[in-house]
UniProtKB/Swiss-Prot annotation:
It comes from the Bacteria. This is Elongation factor Ts. One of its GO terms (molecular function) is translation elongation factor activity. It comes from Actinobacillus pleuropneumoniae serotype 5b (strain L20). GO terms for cellular component: cytoplasm. The gene is tsf. The keyword DNA-binding does not apply. Coiled coil: none annotated. Keywords: Cytoplasm, Elongation factor, Protein biosynthesis.
Length: 283
């Protein structure tokens, strides 16, 4: 039997919105497998949908640069929001972004090695750890960028108007699509969601044959919700992003979105202590 820790219960609660006791029970039944617990909770109706793993917790900045036929996003992390606004920290982050632009295709390992001496000196001066965490490139005929308070960075590649692509970049920042078009959703993702929807229908009392027919409509809705062109456009929810792009004769070929601290968990001692009481004190 896997150990059900407070941090595991906390993560499941944040991803599903379910209560602590429900989350602990689901984890026990799934032997500590959080993804299986989420699937089981969705099938039983305890959770309508689960957020993707990776809570935004670390501080830092996202910087963007545009070159000839490509763009690059760089994430640099620190421990506090105060340091994220420090001139020395921002100066180093901008140096890193400029280097990434001038040396297309550079890896995170190369960036770390290139700036290690300056990073270490700044850590010693400020007294707070920091690191260059991610670098991602995007090629395209036209590249548009959008930065939301230096915390979220988006690059959109496409054909047509740079102005229209920037509007789409703002949409990507707000709506977090995972794919460009509904047909781009991988077969594995579709099969997994289809089975969950079938089980939900069967558990509600529908015969298997009817459940399988019902799922087709739900799957079309699902692939639309996770794809850029299938989502309702944030600037005009009456139409999809795909319809909007057609109306302005613009096409999106790809995009990337980075948010500061994705996948890094900040310790929240008060909440963890609360959960620990339920799980018997395991952290």
């Amino acid at each position: 039997m896997a150990e059900i820790t407070a941090s595991l219960v906390k993560e499941l609660r944040e991803r599903t919105g379910a209560g602590m006791m429900e989350c602990k029970k689901a984890l026990v039944e799934a032997n500590g497998d959080i993804e299986l617990a989420i699937d089981n909770m969705r099938k039983s109706g305890q959770a309508k949908a689960a957020k993707k793993a990776g809570r935004v917790a670390a501080e830092g900045v996202i910087l963007a640069r545009i070159g000839a036929g490509f763009g690059v996003l760089v994430e640099m992390n620190c421990e506090t929001d105060f340091v994220a606004k420090d001139a020395g920290f921002l100066g180093l982050a901008n140096e890193v972004a400029d280097f990434a632009l001038a040396n297309k295709g550079t890896t995170i390992e190369t960036l770390a090695a290139q700036f290690e001496e300056k990073r270490a000196a700044l850590v010693a001066k400020i007294g707070e750890n920091m690191n260059i965490r991610r670098v991602q490139y995007l090629d395209g005929q036209v590249i548009a960028q959008y930065l939301h308070g230096a915390k979220i960075g988006v690059l959109v590649a496409g054909e047509g108007s740079d102005e229209e692509l920037k509007k789409v970049a703002m949409h990507v920042a707000a709506s977090r699509p995972e794919f460009v078009n509904p047909e781009d959703v991988s077969a594995e993702v579709v099969a997994h969601e289809r089975q969950i929807q079938i089980d939900i229908a069967i558990n509600s009392g529908k015969p298997k044959e009817i459940a399988e027919k019902m799922v087709e409509g739900r799957m079309k809705k699902f692939t639309g919700e996770v794809s850029l062109t299938g989502q309702a456009f944030v600037m005009d929810p009456s139409q999809s992003v795909g319809d909007y792009l057609k109306s302005v004769n613009t096409k999106v070929t790809n995009f990337i979105r980075l948010e500061v601290g994705e996948g890094i968990e900040k310790v929240e001692e008060d909440f963890a202590a609360e959960v620990a009481k339920i799980t018997g004190g395991n952290a």
